Amino acid sequence: MISLESQVLERHLSIFADKTLLFAGGVNDDFPVQIQKIAKTVTVWSWYFDYANAQGRKSAVDFSPVCDTQVDVIVYYWTKNKAEVQFQLMQLLANGRDNQEILIVGENRCGVRSAEKMLSAFGDIGKIDSARRCGLYHFRLKKRPHFDINAYWKTYRNPKLDALTVYSLPGVFSADELDGGTELLLSTINTHIRGDVLDLGCGAGVLGAYVKQQNPQARVMLTDIHAMALASAERTLAENRLAGKVLASDVFSHIQGKFDLIISNPPFHDGIGTAYRAVSELIKEARWRLKEDGELRIVANAFLPYPDLLDEHFGSHQVLAKTNKFKVYSVCA
């Protein structure tokens, strides 16, 4: 099954015939694989490790914050994260060929209609199809934008983080400020943490870096599926002179060993909707990833049904802290 966006692209197969192609943005299906039989070459640039890992067995994949691959046609899948879209498109335009051809496709509810406004200063753009509640735009590059990744880095500090400075790139959760859920979870972290600590779904690395800052004796590992999050977490650790391992993993897919503490502010948004797959997998498998007497500590929106999941797999749970919006849950192996 292919996405709505890919169904629209499927109506324009002649554009792809005998061309070198780069798929980028929010592409998340097998359309790049299907198109291989008519294209000259197909490369995928994805920021999402779960998708990149799956596609890597079928086609060439670039899992990285940056991409300098040059092709005949770029196929960009619009996402709802405007900062992420702008970062990716400006980079693609800056690295594109003369008269670079780009197809931009996306669901209307994700804001694809703003493609014309974003790109019109750099070339000719127009809508060529509208179907499946999606828009498809054709763009031809005339003027390259200046792109400097250093201009996209953001930093912030917060009294709740002591002297920690957080570094983040576009597309990373809570890139501009400390979010309420993470702040509540931070309030439960003390200076008595020992052993191996896993920050799962680390984002810019706030939780893992704070644990290491407050507990230098702890060994921390930070993981995420998002390329920009991993780059941000690495810099947050480095700039604060904190030691830690940063690893790409889809929940526990590429994590080895067991931990004394697993902490997480797990995402529950998947695209436009809400999804619990990652959180369900986290809670289900955490029991086998904890050392004896190890602890899983997560923060979540209070309305989410995590207590039932925790009780199902651990027998019981504790609420360590709560506000009107969030709760911090703790379970032990």
Curated annotation (Swiss-Prot):
Subunit structure: Monomer.
Protein name, as recorded: Ribosomal RNA small subunit methyltransferase C
Catalytic activity: guanosine(1207) in 16S rRNA + S-adenosyl-L-methionine = N(2)-methylguanosine(1207) in 16S rRNA + S-adenosyl-L-homocysteine + H(+)
Its EC number(s): 2.1.1.172
Location of the protein in the cell: Cytoplasm
Family stated for the protein in its record: Belongs to the methyltransferase superfamily. RsmC family.
Phylogenetic classification of the source organism: Bacteria, Pseudomonadati, Pseudomonadota, Gammaproteobacteria, Pasteurellales
Organism this protein belongs to: Actinobacillus succinogenes (strain ATCC 55618 / DSM 22257 / CCUG 43843 / 130Z)
Recorded GO CC terms: cytoplasm
Pfam families xrefs: MTS, MTS_N
Main location: cytoplasm
InterPro entries with a match to the protein in the record: DNA_methylase_N6_adenine_CS, Mtase_sm_N, rRNA_ssu_MeTfrase_C, RsmC/RlmG, SAM-dependent_MTases_sf, Small_mtfrase_dom
Record keyword DNA-binding present: no
A molecular-function term among this protein's GO annotations: 16S rRNA (guanine(1207)-N(2))-methyltransferase activity
UniProtKB keywords: Cytoplasm, Methyltransferase, rRNA processing, S-adenosyl-L-methionine, Transferase
Top-level class of the enzyme under EC nomenclature: transferase
Gene responsible for this protein: rsmC
Disulfide bonds: none
Its biological purpose: Specifically methylates the guanine in position 1207 of 16S rRNA in the 30S particle.
Superkingdom field: Bacteria
